[in-house]
């Protein structure tokens, strides 16, 4: 279910502060965050944000096509290791 248009998109306050500070200084640094639920807004375009996936921070370069999506969409949390082998010989 989508967020109501009456409300603004959710962006963690500390993340918004860091992005605004870098925009004012016109610097590009990697911003480390645990806030996977934050929505990507146009002021974040061009920055690299390291999003936590539960184990490590994955760097995500923000482009204009990502605006409106959540940060967590670009940092997968699960790794598929393959299905279990069909090893019937070991069970007998």
UniProtKB/Swiss-Prot annotation:
GO terms for molecular function: rRNA binding; structural constituent of ribosome. SUPFAM superfamilies: Ribosomal protein S19. Its main location: plastid. Transmembrane segments: none annotated. It is found in: Plastid, Chloroplast. Keywords: Chloroplast, Plastid, Ribonucleoprotein, Ribosomal protein, RNA-binding, rRNA-binding. GO terms for biological process: ribosomal small subunit assembly; translation. GO terms for cellular component: chloroplast; mitochondrial small ribosomal subunit. Protein S19 forms a complex with S13 that binds strongly to the 16S ribosomal RNA. NCBIfam families: rpsS_bact (TIGR01050). PANTHER family: RIBOSOMAL PROTEIN S19P FAMILY MEMBER, SMALL RIBOSOMAL SUBUNIT PROTEIN US19M. Belongs to the universal ribosomal protein uS19 family. This is Small ribosomal subunit protein uS19c. The gene is rps19.
